[in-house]
Regions:
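Membrane-embedded alpha-helical bundles of multi-pass transporters/translocases
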Residues: 2-456
Length: 456
């Protein structure tokens, strides 16, 4: 029997555009915050890394907290849309604050300014916005194919935005005056764009009635299912092995992204051309977008996500190994590096596209095994993964730069720094892809749900 469809094409496109807003925050922050803080503000990368790690201590708690709040929210706009709408206002303000650190402050005050703004952005505002945005996948449709399509549209916009930001930001900073003023102006422009697009995305979809989401008209049953505290919510998540797999995978992907963002340093100090970072961004994001276009069709053709995800990520792992080989050829064979980078990105695309549908399947697994509807809490893995993985990745890059004696005042870095940059940009991404492939080979949530339904 054909599944009921809930969405028009413009609903899916409107929803997907929300990740333009998400990435004018995340892509901008993850790609450029370290080089801004070290080369413009003059802060120590090791101390910055430590502050980011300290900030991450709050993130796990706030993810579950906001996920639980979303599950228990009842409003005319639904459960998730109010949090997505209002959370972004704080995102815009704190993003500008991070890239507007006064240069005339003492260094202690500058570190404190960064820590406060970064923590508020990640632990509070981005958490509320991103969990709500991700949870909409399960709240506006029950059709699994539409959930995959929503994920594909979302990440097509995400990677296109990331590509644009990585390609134009450094040039835009220079064009707008350079230095601290240039960074501040660019941040303001991105924040305004994000506010406008996020608002459009919120009002492009409508959440389904709660009774339809849980296949019951019994209001008391719905209310009973929502009666759990934060500790119980954490236990529900920890008890879902597929949630834990996705959460770890998400964290590893964000650490991967932080290592790839070291391309700004790699291009500048090893390849000798800062502009090559933008070229590598094209080699990553265009294949990802192409893969996302075909992901819904491939999922339908292969009757599920499992085989597609495992096979495509195996291709990505092999390709990243070849990127490393090409990178260690003398000063680096740029042509081969670009080729294998593109193939690796093509392999990573399907999982990006169907990840939200996999999380929805995880939520269904909890419903089938525990009879608890925890869609908002379940989608905490997206926010937790982005913040914890991205933050930890950025912290690690700061620590490794400091340990390798990076000096922003030098045009030629010491050999220890050059070696470390190669490890961060070439070796670690390959290792992370290999681990993700192994985890995906165990991600049989669709099969588990089918068995549970058959047993009812």
């Amino acid at each position: 029997m054909t599944e009921k469809r809930y969405l028009k094409w413009y609903n899916k496109v409107g929803y997907g555009s929300g990740d333009i807003a998400g990435n004018v925050v995340y892509a901008f922050l993850s790609s450029f915050v370290m080089i801004y803080l070290t080369n413009t503000v003059g802060l120590n990368p090791g101390i910055v890394g430590t502050l980011i790690a300290v900030s991450k201590l709050l993130d796990g708690v706030t993810d579950i907290f906001f996920g639980s709040l979303i599950d228990k929210t009842h409003s005319k706009m639904g459960k998730a849309r109010p949090w997505m709408l209002y959370g972004y206002i704080g995102c815009a303000i704190t993003l500008v604050a991070i890239f507007a650190i006064p240069t005339n402050l003492g260094q202690f005050a500058q570190y404190a300014w960064f820590l406060i703004a970064y923590t508020l952005l990640n632990a509070v505002f981005y958490t509320a916005n991103n969990i709500a945005y991700s949870a909409l996948t399960a709240l506006v449709t029950k059709n699994s194919a539409e959930q995959v399509e929503m994920g594909s549209w979302r990440f097509m916009f995400a990677f296109a935005t990331s590509l644009l930001i990585q390609s134009i930001t450094l040039g835009a900073v220079t064009a707008l005056g350079g230095g601290a003023a240039g960074w501040r102006t660019v941040a303001i422009i991105y924040a305004i764009i994000g506010l406008l697009v996020n608002t459009l995305s919120v009002f492009s979809v409508k959440e389904l009635p709660e009774g339809e989401l849980v296949d019951t008209t019994d209001k008391k049953e719905i209310e009973q299912d929502e009666k759990y505290n934060l500790v119980q919510a954490a236990k529900l998540l920890a008890g879902n092995k597929f949630y834990m797999m996705i959460c770890v995978t998400y964290i590893l992907q964000q650490i991967y992204g932080a290592m790839i963002s070291m391309g700004t340093y790699y291009a500048t100090y090893i390849l000798g051309n800062q502009n090559l970072f933008g070229v590598f961004s094209w080699a990553i994001n265009i294949p990802l977008i192409i893969a996302l276009v075909f992901t819904p069709t491939l999922v339908a053709k292969w009757n599920g996500m499992y085989k597609l995800n495992v096979m495509s990520y195996t291709l990505a792992t092999i390709s990243r190994a070849l990127v490393a080989v090409a990178g260690y050829m003398g000063s680096g064979n740029v042509t081969l590096m670009l080729l294998f980078t593109a193939i690796a990105a093509l392999g990573q695309g399907p999982w990006q596209g169907d990840m939200n549908a996999a999380i929805a399947a995880c939520s269904e697994y909890t419903w089938l095994t525990k009879h608890k509807r925890v869609d908002g809490t379940m989608y905490s893995c997206t926010s937790l993964g982005v913040k914890l993985g991205g933050g930890l990745g950025t912290a690690i890059t700061g620590w490794l730069l400091a340990a390798s004696h990076f000096d922003s005042a030098l045009t030629v870095q010491p050999a220890s720094c050059i070696s470390m940059l190669k490890i961060m940009y070439l070796v670690i991404p390959f290792a992370l892809d290999a681990i993700i492939t192994f985890i995906l080979s165990r991600m049989k949530v669709e099969e588990a749900n089918e068995k549970l339904r058959a047993a009812v």
